[in-house]
Regions:
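Secretory targeting and sorting signals
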Residues: 1-29
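N-terminal module-boundary/linker segments of secreted carbohydrate-active enzymes
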Residues: 20, 25-69
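Exposed alpha-helical structural elements
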Residues: 38-44, 74-78, 183
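A general structural signal for short secondary-structure junctions and capping/turn motifs
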Residues: 47, 68-70, 91, 141-145
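N-terminal carbohydrate-binding/catalytic regions of secreted carbohydrate-active enzymes
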Residues: 55-96
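Domain-level detector of nuclease and nuclease-like folds
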Residues: 99-190
């Protein structure tokens, strides 16, 4: 995803990179993004060009929530990774636990109120070049647990974000701007 479009992202990222958080969160989080300096290097390496269209886009073209381990799919794996005291049933569905939505600073105790957000939305990836990827590569992108592409957040914050990029949406929790920008750059650099 290294050569994909970054539409109006540079100003937002430059501002976000100026706010480096010095504390470690007291909740689970996806894999740590690269450092601020590495993120800046990645950002400088990205190609900026006109964004494509959503013609032909469908979420179904990004097979997601595949089985990761046993009978746990990607969604369930992220719920366990990002939650605390998560208990699952025999089908790997979360029956209890707590999830902190960093986007809007909300604690959730019912997994049905938790969405798994794609940091770089699938439709945005499509407009940035994923329309030319193989189905296998789109599946890997939609289920990526190696980078901070997937994060458990409140359903309301995820729906507010929708398919928007950082020029149109940032987390309501302004303390999250820097981490969000670094996550976005890391996924885009891939």
């Amino acid at each position: 995803m290294r050569r994909l479009v970054i539409r109006s992202l540079l100003p937002a990222v430059a501002i976000a990179l100026a706010f480096v958080l010095g504390t470690t969160p007291a909740y689970a989080y996806p894999p740590d993004p690269p450092s601020v300096s590495t993120s800046q290097t990645y950002l400088n390496a990205l190609t900026v060009r006109a964004e494509g269209s959503t013609d032909g886009y469908s979420r179904d073209l990004f097979p997601h929530w595949h089985i990761v381990s046993g009978n746990c799919d990607t969604r369930e794996t992220v719920l366990k990774r990002d939650g605390t005291n998560v208990v699952t049933d025999s089908a790997c569905h979360a029956t209890s636990g707590r999830w902190y939505s960093v986007y809007d600073s909300v604690w959730l105790t019912d997994s049905s109120g938790v969405d798994i957000d794609h940091i770089v939305p699938l439709a945005e990836a499509w407009k940035s070049g994923a329309d030319k990827w193989t189905t296998s590569r789109r599946e890997q992108f939609a289920n990526d647990l190696d980078r901070a592409q997937l994060i458990a957040v409140s359903a309301s914050s995820n729906r507010s974000k929708g398919d928007k990029d950082p020029s149109l949406w940032k987390p309501p929790n302004t303390n999250e701007y820097c981490m969000y920008a670094r996550d976005w750059i890391w996924v885009k650099y891939y």
